[in-house]
C-alpha cells in the first residue's frame, strides 16, 4: 500500500488552449496538513476542482491516485464517497434549517416508509459537535442563530459525517475572529491526530505556518516547490509565491500630509433590528489632505457602520454631519457622496462592489457611465479608452475587458472595484477591508496604489482587521471600541499592543497622541 493517501501527478488543465495548470504534482499523507499557497489566479482553485471532480476525469490530463489506486471520478458525489470533501470559502449551509438538518443534508437518516429519523440525526449531530469540542451547541436551532465561527464548525461536522478522510479547507478563516481562528486551528490539529488529512488554502500565511506540516506553492499554473514547514518561513513562502524577494510587505510612497479637508461630526448609527441601540456613538474626527487614516478595532466595534454612514450606505438610521473643504456636504446616498467627492470600496465586494452579470469593463465604468453619454448614445471608444487605462494602471490581469468579472480572481476583482471608484476622481477614498481575500502580490500593489494616491493629494480612510496592515500603511490610526472613539494616534513607533489596549479600554476619554491634528 502507498504511503500517500493522495497523489496528483502531472495535472494539466486547459481552457481554450490556455493551460491553467501545467504539470502540477501534489501529495498528501494520512494525518498530514498540506498548505496550498499561491497568488490569486495561480491555479489553486482549479486544482481543487480537478481533485473534487467539478472538472470530471477526462477533462484534464495526468493522474490522481487515491490510496494508491487510480481515481477517475465523474462527479462530486463520487469523490465525497471516496472521502474527499471540500469546505468552500462561501459556506453552503441553509440558514433556516437546523444545525442537524444541515449536517445531514443529502444524507438524511430515514425510518421505514421514508420519514425522516430526526431523533437519530439529532443524536449523531450532537456526537459530531462533541467531537469538535462544542458540546453545548443546540443542534435543533436554525444554523443562522450561530456566528461565522460556529457555522464553520458545522461545515466541518458535515464533512466528517460524510466520512471525510481528506478535508480541503478553502480560505476557512476569512470571516472569523481571532479567537474563532484559534479554535479552528486546534480542531485541525485534533483531526490530524485522528488520521484525517487536510489541504489548507489560505492567504493568511501565519495560519499556514501554525497548522501545516508541508507547504506546496504553485505559481502561474506550475508547481514551484513542496517543502516541510520546519524548513520554511513566511518570507520564503512569499518569495516562492511571487517569484521575487519582497523585502518590504508594506511599501511606502513619499507623500505630504497637508491641511484638514474632511471632517466627520458626531456620527451616530442605530442598529437596524433594534433602533434604540447605538452601533456608533457620537464619533468625530478630522482627515488631512494626502493622509492615510487607518481605522482599527475588534470585530463588531462599529468600524464598517461608521464608514458606511460617511458614504450614505448605512441601511439603518444615522445622524451627524460630513464636511469637505470647510463646507457641509450631502452624503445621504452613495450617489450624492460620489458627486461630492467621497467614494467607498465596500467590505463585501461580491455583494456590494461588483455586478456579476456584467463584464470587467462595464463594472469599471459603471459609476461614471453618464460621462460617456450624449443623451442618445454612449461613446464606446472613449469608454474603452478609460477602461484600458485603468486596467493598465491597476495591473489588472484579464485577457479581455469583455470577459465576465466573475472570471477574475478575487484580487483582480478588487482592483476592478478600485478602478471604478478612482474613475470618479475622489478627494476622499474610503477602503473597507481592501485586501480581504487578496493574495500577497495583489496586496503589495494595493498598498503602492494607496501611497501613490496620497502623493496626489487624495485622502484615504482604511478600515482593516489586520493590525499589521493598519500600522504598515497608515499615517494616523483611529481606534473604535463598542461604537466609540477609543484612540487617535499618530503612527510613529505605534505598536499593536497600544492599539489593542485602546480597543479594549472603556475610558470616556480616548487615548490620543495626535492632538496636533485637530
Swiss-Prot record:
Stored InterPro entries: AAA+_ATPase, ABC_carbohydrate_import_ATPase, ABC_transporter-like_ATP-bd, ABC_transporter-like_CS, ABC_transptr_XylG, P-loop_NTPase
GO molecular function terms noted in the UniProt entry: ABC-type D-xylose transporter activity; ATP binding; ATP hydrolysis activity
Keywords: ATP-binding, Cell inner membrane, Cell membrane, Membrane, Nucleotide-binding, Repeat, Sugar transport, Translocase, Transport
UniProt xrefs under Gene3D superfamilies: P-loop containing nucleotide triphosphate hydrolases
UniProt superkingdom: Bacteria
Residues reported in the UniProt entry to bind ATP: 38-45
EC number: 7.5.2.10
Membrane topology: Peripheral membrane protein
Subcellular location: Cell inner membrane
Major site of localization recorded for this protein: membrane
Presence of the UniProt keyword Repeat in the record: yes
Record's catalysed reaction(s): D-xylose(out) + ATP + H2O = D-xylose(in) + ADP + phosphate + H(+)
A matching Pfam family: ABC_tran
A cellular component annotation (GO) from this entry: plasma membrane
Keyword match Cell membrane: yes
Segments forming domain ABC transporter: 6-245, 262-507
General function of this protein: Part of the ABC transporter complex XylFGH involved in xylose import. Responsible for energy coupling to the transport system.
PANTHER family with a match to the protein in the record: CARBOHYDRATE TRANSPORT ATP-BINDING PROTEIN MG119-RELATED, XYLOSE IMPORT ATP-BINDING PROTEIN XYLG
Assembly description: The complex is composed of two ATP-binding proteins (XylG), two transmembrane proteins (XylH) and a solute-binding protein (XylF).
Family from the record: Belongs to the ABC transporter superfamily. Xylose importer (TC 3.A.1.2.4) family.
Name of the molecule in the record: Xylose import ATP-binding protein XylG
Organism for this UniProt entry: Pseudomonas syringae pv. syringae (strain B728a)
Amino acid at each position: 500500500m502507498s504511503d500517500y493517501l493522495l497523489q496528483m501527478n502531472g495535472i494539466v488543465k486547459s481552457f481554450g488552449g490556455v493551460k491553467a495548470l501545467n504539470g502540477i504534482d501534489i501529495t498528501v499523507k494520512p494525518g498530514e496538513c498540506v498548505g496550498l499557497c499561491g497568488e490569486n489566479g495561480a491555479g489553486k482553485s482549479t486544482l481543487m476542482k480537478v481533485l473534487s471532480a467539478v472538472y470530471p476525469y477526462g477533462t484534464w490530463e495526468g493522474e490522481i491516485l487515491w490510496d494508491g489506486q487510480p481515481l477517475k471520478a465523474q462527479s462530486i458525489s463520487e469523490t465525497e464517497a471516496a472521502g474527499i470533501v471540500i469546505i468552500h470559502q462561501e459556506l453552503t449551509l441553509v440558514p433556516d434549517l437546523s444545525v442537524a438538518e444541515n449536517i445531514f443534508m443529502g444524507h438524511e437518516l430515514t425510518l421505514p416508509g421514508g420519514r425522516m429519523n430526526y431523533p437519530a440525526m439529532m443524536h449523531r449531530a450532537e456526537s459530531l459537535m462533541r467531537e469538535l469540542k462544542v458540546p453545548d451547541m443546540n443542534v435543533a436551532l436554525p444554523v443562522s442563530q450561530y456566528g461565522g465561527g460556529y457555522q464553520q464548525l458545522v461545515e466541518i461536522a458535515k464533512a466528517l459525517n460524510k466520512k471525510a478522510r481528506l478535508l480541503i479547507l478553502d480560505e476557512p478563516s476569512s470571516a472569523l475572529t481571532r479567537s474563532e481562528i484559534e479554535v479552528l486551528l486546534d480542531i485541525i490539529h485534533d483531526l490530524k491526530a485522528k488520521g484525517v488529512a487536510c489541504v489548507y488554502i489560505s492567504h493568511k500565511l501565519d495560519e499556514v505556518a501554525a497548522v501545516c506540516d508541508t507547504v506546496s506553492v504553485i505559481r502561474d499554473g506550475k508547481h514551484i516547490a513542496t517543502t516541510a514547514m520546519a524548513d520554511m518561513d513566511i518570507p520564503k513562502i512569499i518569495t516562492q509565491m511571487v517569484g521575487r524577494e519582497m523585502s518590504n510587505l508594506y511599501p511606502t510612497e513619499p507623500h505630504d500630509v497637508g491641511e484638514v479637508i474632511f471632517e466627520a461630526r458626531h456620527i451616530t448609527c442605530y442598529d437596524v433590528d433594534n433602533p434604540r441601540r447605538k452601533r456608533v456613538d457620537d464619533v468625530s474626527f478630522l482627515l488631512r489632505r494626502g493622509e492615510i487614516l487607518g481605522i482599527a478595532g475588534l470585530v463588531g466595534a462599529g468600524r464598517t457602520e461608521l464608514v458606511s454612514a460617511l458614504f450614505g450606505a448605512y441601511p439603518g438610521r444615522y445622524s451627524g454631519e460630513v464636511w469637505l473643504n470647510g463646507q457641509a456636504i450631502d452624503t445621504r446616498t452613495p450617489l450624492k457622496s460620489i458627486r461630492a467627492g467621497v467614494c467607498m470600496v465596500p467590505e463585501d465586494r461580491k455583494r456590494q462592489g461588483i455586478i456579476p452579470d456584467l463584464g470587467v469593463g462595464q463594472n469599471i465604468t459603471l459609476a461614471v457611465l453618464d460621462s460617456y453619454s450624449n443623451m442618445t448614445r454612449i461613446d464606446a471608444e472613449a469608454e474603452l479608452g478609460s477602461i484600458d487605462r485603468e486596467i493598465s494602471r491597476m495591473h489588472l490581469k484579464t485577457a479581455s475587458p469583455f470577459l465576465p468579472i466573475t472570471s477574475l480572481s478575487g484580487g483582480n476583482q478588487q482592483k476592478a472595484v478600485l478602478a471604478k471608484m478612482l474613475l470618479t476622481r475622489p478627494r476622499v477614498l474610503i477602503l473597507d477591508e481592501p485586501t480581504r481575500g487578496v493574495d500577497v502580490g495583489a496586496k503589495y500593489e494595493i498598498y503602492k496604489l494607496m501611497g501613490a494616491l496620497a502623493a496626489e493629494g487624495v485622502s484615504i480612510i482604511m478600515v482593516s482587521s489586520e493590525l499589521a496592515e493598519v500600522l504598515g500603511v497608515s499615517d494616523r490610526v483611529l481606534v473604535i471600541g463598542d461604537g466609540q472613539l477609543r484612540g487617535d494616534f499618530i503612527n510613529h513607533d505605534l505598536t499593536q499592543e497600544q492599539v489593542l489596549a485602546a480597543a479594549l479600554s472603556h475610558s470616556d476619554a480616548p487615548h490620543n497622541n495626535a492632538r496636533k491634528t485637530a
